[in-house]
Design a protein with these regions (language model features):
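Short, small-residue-biased leader/transition segments that mark boundaries at the very start
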Residues: 2-9
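Alpha-helical scaffolding segments of alpha/beta enzyme cores, especially the outer helices
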Residues: 59, 90-101, 126, 201, ...
Length: 222
């Protein structure tokens, strides 16, 4: 995910990526986003139950515009979030409108994207390109693949030199076909959604069992 953010949306060293304090790129990548972008900064935006808000994003974008401060270039949001919550279509489009109005691109960390589509019972396009997302890292391992994620560009211009950035970042395997082939079976007949619905059902079953324990409650509604 850290390299997908860099590879899909090249960011200048003086640029900044907006995320929230629990975002995977912030807490679980050992500074890799900054490393792969030669020094760009992660700016933390307020969030509500693990979700960015358009108001919070706007506050960070407009906080400072002087040359002494990193220039916001990208907003990255995670669907489903690290806390198990979901962005609905209106929430994604609201954030995207703010970003686009100020010249920022929108990146989606879709490690659990299949779970979100299954839970929201919507078309994948409704919460991606139709809502203003420029690129998504479409998660494969959490759908059951042994390895591999797929980067999809909805803004085609961003992908013009993707192969070079991918190669430079060490993401071009000598046997790439072995990473690519499992996707054919995963996407056939909506297997990815079948797996996601099953995973969601098991998560709901676990949540219900925990909630039934005296004194136990779920941290967030998911």
């Amino acid at each position: 995910r850290h390299s997908s953010l860099h590879d899909a949306l090249p960011i200048s060293p003086y640029g900044a990526v907006l995320c929230h304090e629990s975002a995977h790129v912030q807490v679980d990548e050992c500074g890799a986003p900054e490393f792969f972008s030669s020094g760009s900064k992660l700016l933390l935006s307020p969030h509500r139950q693990g979700k960015l808000t358009s108001a919070g994003v706007l506050e960070v974008i407009t906080r400072r515009t002087d040359i002494h401060y990193p220039r916001p270039k990208v907003v990255t949001l995670t669907q489903s979030t690290e806390l198990g919550t979901l962005y609905h279509k209106g929430e994604v489009s609201s954030i995207a409108r703010v970003a686009q109005a100020h010249g920022l691109k929108v990146h989606m960390d879709g490690a659990r994207f299949a779970n979100a589509v299954a839970a929201l019972n919507c078309a994948p396009a409704d919460i991606t390109w139709r809502a203003g997302v420029d690129a998504i890292c479409f998660g494969g391992t959490k759908m059951g693949l042994p390895v591999g994620e797929a980067i999809l560009f909805f803004n085609r211009e961003l992908g013009e030199e993707f192969s070079y950035r991918c190669k430079q970042a060490g993401q071009l395997a000598s046997k790439m076909r072995y990473l690519s082939a499992p996707w054919l079976a995963m996407l056939k007949d909506d297997n990815w959604l079948h797996h996601a619905r099953h995973a969601n059902a098991m998560a709901r079953r676990l949540a219900d069992k925990i909630s039934a324990i005296d004194g136990a409650e779920m941290l967030l509604p998911t």
